[in-house]
């Protein structure tokens, strides 16, 4: 961000009735970008990246705000993701400052399309990305993980496994989880990462196949190929399935009892 800019996240907090300091966060980002991330004047629609995730968060809030939960649910639409995960860092810092016990962060980023750049369509899967041990861990930390666990059982990985089982058990949704054991896609990032950096369990939901012509692109047509992240490229029935999986996961985690002392 080249000039001082006020960063605004849109956050709704549904307080828990029994353990309000235990928190589940569902989030997406409301900003978008064109081909040049520094171009702040050109039209830059972001239907899939990430209006799809924002719509998911709003629908989750509409449905779940009619219920009560023992733990707190936070619905967050974050700013500045494309400029360096700024809104995610702001909310993660706030969670730390407030002393929240964050049970899970469900980050939804690019969840509304089912067709890839090569025309292959997959509306039966959603990827869930989760970070394990850091590659730059110290020798002391590696030794500790070997002794006490952690090589492949990080809290984020366990959330991924659990969400996959949740989807598997509900065959009516028509959606299976493809677990990706990486922090994010190759060379990419998302607002789950600032939470992972602070030790909070966090995963990212994203589409099964990448459509590079319709993300981070100026609106144009080249060689008969249309570029740009526009609403006509969305698959709303697919998005609805991802919404339902998120809502089911959120309800279960928000209702779960605390760990035994």
Residues of each region from the PLM?
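Metal-dependent peptidase/peptidase-like ectodomains
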Residues: 78-193, 198, 202
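Short helix-loop-beta-strand segments that form the rim/entrance of peptidase-like active sites
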Residues: 62-86
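Second-shell loop/turn segments in exported
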Residues: 1, 38-50, 63, 77-78, ...
């Amino acid at each position: 961000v080249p000039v001082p800019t006020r960063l605004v996240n849109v956050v709704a907090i549904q307080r828990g009735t029994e353990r309000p300091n235990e928190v589940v966060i569902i989030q997406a980002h409301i900003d978008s970008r064109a081909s040049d991330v520094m171009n702040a004047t050109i039209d830059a629609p972001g239907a899939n990246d990430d209006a799809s995730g924002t719509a998911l968060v709003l629908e989750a809030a509409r449905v779940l705000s009619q219920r009560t939960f023992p733990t707190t649910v936070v619905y967050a639409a974050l700013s500045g993701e494309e400029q360096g995960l700024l809104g995610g860092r702001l909310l993660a810092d706030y969670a730390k400052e407030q002393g929240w016990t964050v049970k899970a962060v469900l980050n939804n980023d690019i969840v509304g399309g089912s067709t890839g750049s090569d025309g292959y369509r997959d509306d039966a899967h959603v990827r869930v990305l989760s970070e394990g041990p850091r590659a730059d861990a110290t020798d002391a930390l590696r030794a500790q993980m070997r002794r006490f666990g952690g090589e492949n059982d990080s809290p984020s990985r366990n959330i991924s496994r659990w969400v996959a089982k949740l989807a598997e058990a509900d065959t009516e949704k028509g959606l299976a989880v493809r677990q990706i054991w990486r922090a994010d896609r190759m060379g990419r990032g998302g607002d789950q990462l600032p939470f992972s950096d602070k030790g909070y369990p966090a995963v990212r939901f994203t589409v099964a196949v990448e459509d590079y012509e319709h993300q981070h692109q100026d609106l144009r047509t080249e060689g008969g190929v249309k570029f740009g992240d526009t609403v006509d490229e969305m698959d709303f029935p697919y998005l609805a399935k991802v919404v339902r999986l998120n809502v089911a996961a959120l309800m279960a985690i928000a209702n779960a009892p605390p760990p035994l002392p």
